[in-house]
Amino acid sequence: MGFTDKQEALVNSSSEFKQNLPGYSILFYTIVLEKAPAAKGLFSFLKDTAGVEDSPKLQAHAEQVFGLVRDSAAQLRTKGEVVLGNATLGAIHVQKGVTNPHFVVVKEALLQTIKKASGNNWSEELNTAWEVAYDGLATAIKKAMKTA
């Protein structure tokens, strides 16, 4: 069964996240670093900081991650697969030393952040839609990493 219109709508219903981008960006990266402290060095905007601090670069990167997942949801519904619009994503992830466990950590942080942002609107169905969309994106990035 392919990605449905309803699943895409659930992924795109993240207005709560957009309304508090600074707070949820900090939460997202805090969860990433709690799960994988060594990942701090993978993010240029976190390298020289004592912890996760709000910054335009942090917010921009978080919005990019969430935006890529939303785009993946649309592609999964229309094409059944995710094709990266940014051909350099694979090379960037290789250059940074990203490995398979990093994708798991980011997925867990993403899902926890969405759960917090969704509040009473959170559901297993919402969680699954985001998870499937993220998995599609991760698969596309890993594929691009192999050819980078």
Swiss-Prot record:
Summary of the tissues where the protein is detected: Root nodules.
Induction per the UniProt record: Strongly reduced levels in boron-deficient nodules. Inhibited by abscisic acid (ABA) in parallel with lower nitrogen fixation in nodules.
Positions bound to heme b: 44, 93, 96
Any one of the GO BP annotations: response to abscisic acid
GO molecular function, one term: oxygen binding
Globin domain span: 2-146
Record-level GO cellular component terms: cytosol; nucleus
Localization: Cytoplasm, Cytosol; Nucleus
Residues with the Phosphoserine modification: 44
Key words of the record: Cytoplasm, Heme, Iron, Metal-binding, Nitration, Nitrogen fixation, Nodulation, Nucleus, Oxygen transport, Phosphoprotein, Transport
Pfam families: Globin
Binding annotation for O2: 61
In-chain residues carrying the UniProt-annotated modification Nitrated tyrosine: 24, 29, 134
InterPro entries hit by this protein: Globin, Globin-like_sf, Globin/Proto, Leghaemoglobin-like, Leghaemoglobin_Fe_BS
Modification note: Nitrated in effective nodules and particularly in hypoxic conditions; this mechanism may play a protective role in the symbiosis by buffering toxic peroxynitrite NO(2)(-). Nitration level decrease during nodule senescence. Phosphorylation at Ser-44 disrupts the molecular environment of its porphyrin ring oxygen binding pocket, thus leading to a reduced oxygen consumption and to the delivery of oxygen O(2) to symbiosomes.
Job of this protein: Leghemoglobin that reversibly binds oxygen O(2) through a pentacoordinated heme iron. In root nodules, facilitates the diffusion of oxygen to the bacteroids while preventing the bacterial nitrogenase from being inactivated by buffering dioxygen, nitric oxide and carbon monoxide, and promoting the formation of reactive oxygen species (ROS, e.g. H(2)O(2)). This role is essential for symbiotic nitrogen fixation (SNF).
Family: Belongs to the plant globin family.
Self-association and partners: Monomer.
Protein name per its UniProtKB record: Leghemoglobin-1
